Curated annotation (Swiss-Prot):
Similarity-based family: Belongs to the UPF0397 family.
Organism: Phytoplasma australiense
Protein name, UniProt field: UPF0397 protein PA0141
Top-level taxonomy: Bacteria, Bacillati, Mycoplasmatota, Mollicutes, Acholeplasmatales
Listed transmembrane segments: 11-31, 43-63, 69-89, 109-129, 147-167
Gene3D superfamilies linked to this entry: 1.10.1760.20
């Protein structure tokens, strides 16, 4: 049983990493100097909330590495770590939001929105700019301005695309998993953790 789960998780990571890379390369909207509206981050957040922190971390790390190689020819490890951290932190909210078994209610949307503001400020407003200054000796004002623009663009992206993806998934697949047996209907209980 453990082997089957790890195979499913590996396939999930591979497929979602490919989608993340495609969105990063072809569906990013430039909004400022070195700042783009990343639809791929909205997808990463959706995947992390749906499948958990391990998948979110893996998709964030692998997807960003492949994207950097395709677009720039080299990698910026501090931003790669930030993408992985973003996926990990959003994956921690999997059991609270619980898209697989429950509706994506207004209360959950509000929680997600506040949580994404906190995570964005932490990861792209503090960790990424400080690591740019520390590793690449970038000017302090420039990196914090870029960090601020990235935080705003991510909040906009998650508010538009992330909430839309989660709402559509929840409406189509998340209400109840019904098992029919002998003309009786049983509802699968959600896992506690």
């Amino acid at each position: 049983m453990k082997k089957n789960t790890s195979i499913k998780q590996t396939v999930t990571i591979a497929i979602n990493t490919a989608i993340y890379v495609i969105l990063s390369c072809f569906a990013s909207i430039p909004i400022g100097p070195n700042v783009v509206l990343e639809t791929s981050f909205s997808f990463l957040v959706f995947v992390a909330v749906l499948f958990g922190s391990k998948v979110g971390l893996s998709v964030g790390l692998l997807g960003h590495i492949i994207k950097d190689f395709f677009l720039f020819g080299n990698v910026y490890f501090n931003w790669i770590v930030c993408s992985g951290l973003l996926g990990f932190l959003f994956g921690l909210s999997k059991n609270l939001i619980n898209l697989k078994y429950h509706s994506f209610t207004r209360k959950k949307i509000l929680f997600f929105w506040l949580y994404q503001v906190f995570v964005n400020v932490l990861v792209f407003g503090l960790i990424a700019p400080i690591s740019d200054v520390w590793i690449y000796a970038q000017p302090l004002k420039l990196v914090f301005l870029q960090g601020f623009l990235v935080v705003l663009s991510n909040i906009l992206s998650y508010s538009l695309f992330g909430i839309f993806l989660m709402s559509k998934y929840s409406n189509n697949y998340g209400k109840k998993e019904v098992l029919a047996s002998n003309n009786c209907v049983y509802y699968k209980k959600p896992p506690l953790f």
